[in-house]
From Swiss-Prot:
Chemical reaction(s) catalysed: a 5'-end NAD(+)-phospho-ribonucleoside in mRNA + H2O = a 5'-end phospho-ribonucleoside in mRNA + NAD(+) + H(+); a 5'-end (N(7)-methyl 5'-triphosphoguanosine)-ribonucleoside-ribonucleotide in mRNA + H2O = a (N(7)-methyl 5'-triphosphoguanosine)-nucleoside + a 5'-end phospho-ribonucleoside in mRNA + H(+); a 5'-end triphospho-ribonucleoside in mRNA + H2O = a 5'-end phospho-ribonucleoside in mRNA + diphosphate + H(+)
Positions of substrate binding: 205, 224, 248
The protein's enzyme class: hydrolase
Major localisation: nucleus
Cofactor(s) needed: a divalent metal cation
Quaternary state and interactors: Interacts with RAT1; the interaction is direct, stabilizes RAT1 protein structure and stimulates its exoribonuclease activity. The interaction also stimulates RAI1 pyrophosphohydrolase activity, probably by recruiting it to mRNA substrates.
Protein name: Decapping nuclease RAI1
Keywords: Hydrolase, Metal-binding, mRNA processing, Nuclease, Nucleotide-binding, Nucleus, RNA-binding
Protein's organism: Yarrowia lipolytica (strain CLIB 122 / E 150)
Sample GO molecular function, one term: nucleotide binding
Coiled coil: none
GO cellular component: cytosol; Las1 complex; nucleus; RNA polymerase II termination complex
Stored Pfam families: RAI1 (PF08652)
């Protein structure tokens, strides 16, 4: 077993994320289109006119069952993209945006959220997934209050988004969304980015188009919910949430973050709009987190990761140990977690 310290930093030059392609997931099926792309439309007068109940429809909602999906839809879409272009993607590391977000924010995680990752090398790339079994350990079924918190986040997306730009939407489409029950369909953007010397391909769910006039990932928006801020504790909770929101938006190149604030009984009280690049300023005075420090930590961690042997189908596990400020690396026995369709495609190239 080897390890490296989480106190290590490596100054990083950055390249702007560039969208390579996108895809939709509908009822679990991947299609190389924008059928699940949504558009933001929630005028202030709509919020002021009458309280929007973010628990409406919860009695008819079934929380999506989590299961171990590895990198399956990302690799399925990548194999489709490469078949169309006839060339292999230029990247050293391939993973989900959410995984890099967890690594990036680890130095400032006050909750000591466990991070256990599996890594394999194949055909010129390191692939990173979160270990499913480790992620499930200690998880408890949400109580009624937590279920309302979870649902209100999904519901905010339903009431704030349209299937088409507002000027193409009918009055019925605009008004009926308040009765919609959220489902698990997704729109995913796949971008190529570079942090330091690390060339990365990441996929991440995108909530909506916020600025239709912008191009690429600059047009996208990320929707978040949080309780109203009434005291210092509420403010600190929001600052920490903003850290995660900033990191995940920064990695994908999303320029806009929209916060919906809920009351104690889960009514939508107000909406705030932020530019992703401005969020680190909100942590400046209290020093709850530093965007620059997180980028440098991510760069150091990914650079260490690339020291692993470039031998096809070998498996390793990375365990982030907050208490001892280190990351342990062990070699694993077992089969690759890569999608067979993708592996077969690469072998046929």
């Amino acid at each position: 077993m080897s390890s490296f310290s989480t106190t290590e930093r490596l100054a990083a030059k950055l390249k702007k994320p560039k969208e390579v392609y996108s895809y939709s997931i509908t009822d679990g099926k991947v299609t190389m289109d924008q059928s699940q792309l949504k558009y933001y439309y929630l005028p202030e007068e709509t919020i002021l006119k009458a309280p929007i109940d973010l628990t409406k429809g919860i009695e008819n909602w079934t929380q999506p069952n989590e299961h171990d999906t590895h990198l399956d839809t990302l690799l399925e879409s990548l194999s489709k993209y490469e078949r169309e272009t006839g060339s292999k993607i230029d990247a050293e590391i391939i993973t989900w945006r959410g995984i890099l977000t967890k690594i990036m924010t680890h130095p400032y995680d006050q909750y000591n959220e466990p991070i256990v990752l599996n890594i394999t090398y194949f055909d010129g790339h390191y692939f990173i997934e979160e270990d499913w079994q480790s992620k499930q350990q200690g998880k408890k079924a949400p109580d009624e209050q937590m279920k309302k918190h979870i649902y209100s986040g999904y519901k905010f997306e339903s009431v704030a988004l349209l299937n088409e730009p507002w000027f193409k939407s009918s009055r019925e489409d605009i008004e009926s969304r308040f009765d919609d029950i959220p489902n698990g369909d997704q729109f995913v953007s796949v971008v190529r980015t570079q942090i330091g010397d690390n060339k990365i391909l990441i996929g991440g769910e995108v909530d909506c188009v916020f600025d239709p006039c912008a191009k690429g990932t600059s047009r996208y928006g990320e929707l978040k919910t949080s309780r109203e801020v009434h005291n210092a504790k509420d403010g600190e909770i929001l600052e920490r949430k903003m850290n995660r929101a900033w990191a995940q938006s920064f990695l994908l190149g999303v320029k806009h973050i929209i916060y919906g604030y809920r009351t104690g009984d889960h009514k939508l009280a107000a909406v705030d709009y932020f530019k992703t690049e401005d969020l680190p300023m909100y942590a400046g005075a209290s020093s709850t987190w530093s965007g620059t420090d997180e980028i440098n930590f991510l760069n150091a961690a990914l650079t260490k990761l690339k020291d692993l042997p470039k031998e096809d189908n070998k498996l390793w596990r990375l365990v982030f140990d907050s208490a001892n400020k280190k990351v342990d690396i062990t070699e694993l026995d077992g089969e690759s977690f890569l999608l067979k369709e993708f592996v077969d495609w690469r072998k046929s190239m």
